[in-house]
Amino acid sequence: MTKKANFYAIHGAFYYLLCSVLVILMVSGCTRDVYDPNGGGEDKPNSFDFSTTSTIQLNVKYDVPEGYKVLFNVYFEDPFTTDEGGQTVLRTDITPAITRMTDENGEYHAKEIVAADHGSDVYIYTSYVGVPGLVQTTITDNVINADIEWKLTDGIPQTRADKWDPSTEYGLLGTWQTNGRPNYLDSEGELVLSASVLKTIRNTIQEGGICPQTYRQSADFKVDDLQGRDTEVSVRFIGGNSSAASIFGYYCYKDGASVKEIKAAKKYIVFPNTHTAGYYGKPIGLKGGECVKLHYIDENGVDKGTVFPNGVRIGWFLLNNAFVKEGKTDKICYSTTALNGDGRTHTAAFRINDFVVLSFEDYTDYDYNDVQFNVWSNPIEAIAPDVPSVTPDPGTDDDRSVAYRMTYKGILAFEDNWPNKGDYDLNDVIVKYNSCLLYTSPSPRDR
């Protein structure tokens, strides 16, 4: 063998040896994946279900006339706060956890999905007239039970408040209890307010809306019976959306009296406490439909009994939140516009057939639904104020108008390997959604 041939033989053997070594190294480096998702074979229970929501049972029942459906909101924290002016207002920094509408019997029963981190306190709020505005309860074993009815706070008879003698400033029709409930209510004049009346009032002067100008007026009502009969005048309490515990009263003056004479007229208290919402422990002494019969007070401030002569006008006033402030208030609202310090008209009035509605705007939001009353006379024709007529709500199930809207927004991320094991990056498909759900007036029972 020549030297050249020997070189090539050695070179070839070395080449094959090197290749063999490389193959062995590559094979020995191909070990299996040592990741063990079970943590080394130990069985550890995984109690985290990745859920951010929970399912609860919601049972709500309002004491309402048949056919009156109530739109309500459920919060897990107090939805009210006090603004710079000292008024209790609905918060704007939170949204309801649940918004629903009852059926025609005032009931709602359904499963609801809420955030898993909800607390135990529950606040149920509605702006609908004729029912309590705010009720606080709790959630127990994932169930909310709320049987909502007019619950008057305890009161004991008294002639005057602890530190305020109203008789030094105002005329009195009688005494009242510590919760502001008059001891002179007229049971014969009490009325169960119908669903049609309540719905018509709600639709005419809506919470959070702007009261149409046509209803705003100086709502001083004139007694004028064409047959000259003895006339009695009464006021029924309807309700309202005010957070204030206001004093409501009236005054009498002759038709054509000057502003000076009207201002000097003796002011009489009718309802010492018009609060019905139950905010911040304020007392409740009235419920919708309860009535007081007025007395005619002559120009000298003398009580002449319950018969009103023709030609007398009756004006109204509201002392904002004065019942819980010993008669003091920073806002007095009169139905006689000329008496209002801000120059504004603070009353709205309209009729539903023969049912005359008087409503106050007690501050500045212009919805004019804060406190509402029904003024009526016997004979009924004796008070026929020139106020707009409103068509009563028909109260039929054909009304399919939108009661409320709920908007859902979010982002969904998908893993396309599920349920097989994979990379779990959850970025294979990403969807951003915006869904608007409309609820009509009939309550959705099956969802």
Each language-model region and where it sits:
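Sec-dependent bacterial lipoprotein signal peptides
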Residues: T2-S28
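Acidic/polar, low-complexity intrinsically disordered N-terminal segments immediately downstream
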Residues: T31-E232, I380-E415
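Extended low-complexity, serine/threonine- and proline-enriched intrinsically disordered segments
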Residues: Y68-G86, S243-I269, R447
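Short Pro-Gly-centered beta-turn/loop motif in secreted/extracellular proteins
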Residues: D103-D121, V292-V312
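A short, solvent-exposed beta-strand micro-motif common in secreted/extracellular proteins
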Residues: H118-G130, V312-G327, I332
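Structured interaction patches on ligand/partner-binding surfaces of diverse proteins
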Residues: V129-P157, F323-V356, V431
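Short beta-strand-plus-loop segments that form exposed binding edges in beta-rich domains
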Residues: E361-T364
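Conserved small/polar residues in nucleotide/adenosyl-binding loops
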Residues: Y439-D446
